[in-house]
């Protein structure tokens, strides 16, 4: 074994040792932060709206976790779904019906359950924001990917062909 390879081995070993020694402190710090971090409310108004326009009605549905539910903002019309509906109404001069179906703490698995419980509708555009809570709950990537495929299949059930847009997984 050369001096250089021994040096790399020792540095790697020291890294694991430091992580092992710091882990209990980091774990306790995480528990403390979870207790003291401010919990922001979701908007208190109705999570749907209708924007008047001409021509065929455009149906928009927003699904997901806290980022989609509007945590920390005053009105659902200021959520990603509400703002998308407003902009499409302005650009296309069509009536837009929009609805937000989102909850704090949802994972891809619980989102799939929520989708199964909803009646099938003729939605034209579905916006999905999911993944942050899966990261916190340490969902394995292969399980997340499998459940994401199930999500798309559930959204397209009954022969529907909505445009489904996924936002990137939030940086956590």
Model-derived features with residue positions:
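Catalytic nucleophile-elbow at a beta strand-turn-alpha helix junction centered on a G-D-S/GDSL motif
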Residues: 56-74
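Extracellular glycan-modifying ectodomains
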Residues: 2-12, 16, 103-104, 110-114, ...
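Alpha-helical cap/lid subdomain in secreted, periplasmic
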Residues: 116-172
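Conserved beta-strand elements of the Class I
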Residues: 59-61, 99, 126-128
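Surface-exposed cleft-lining segments at the edges of enzyme active sites
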Residues: 70, 100-108, 132-143
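N-terminal secretory targeting modules
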Residues: 1-61, 91, 121
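Short hydrophobic segments within beta-strands
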Residues: 63-64, 101, 167
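Membrane-embedded segments
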Residues: 72-124
């Amino acid at each position: 074994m050369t001096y250089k390879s021994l040096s790399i081995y020792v540095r790697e070993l020291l890294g694991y040792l430091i992580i092992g020694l710091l882990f209990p402190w980091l774990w306790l710090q995480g528990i403390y932060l979870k207790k003291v971090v401010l919990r922001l409310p979701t908007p208190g108004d109705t999570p749907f709206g209708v924007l008047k326009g001409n021509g065929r009605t455009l149906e928009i549905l927003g699904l997901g976790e806290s980022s989609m539910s509007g945590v920390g903002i005053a009105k659902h019309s200021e959520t990603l779904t509400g703002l998308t509906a407003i902009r499409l109404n302005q650009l296309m001069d069509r009536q837009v019906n929009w609805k937000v179906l989102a909850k704090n703490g949802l994972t891809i698995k619980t989102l799939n359950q929520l989708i199964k419980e909803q009646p099938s509708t003729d939605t034209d555009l579905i916006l999905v924001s999911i993944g942050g809570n899966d990261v916190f709950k340490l969902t394995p990537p292969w399980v997340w990917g499998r459940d994401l495929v199930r999500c798309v299949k559930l959204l397209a059930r009954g022969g529907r062909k909505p445009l489904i847009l996924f936002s990137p997984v939030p940086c956590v």
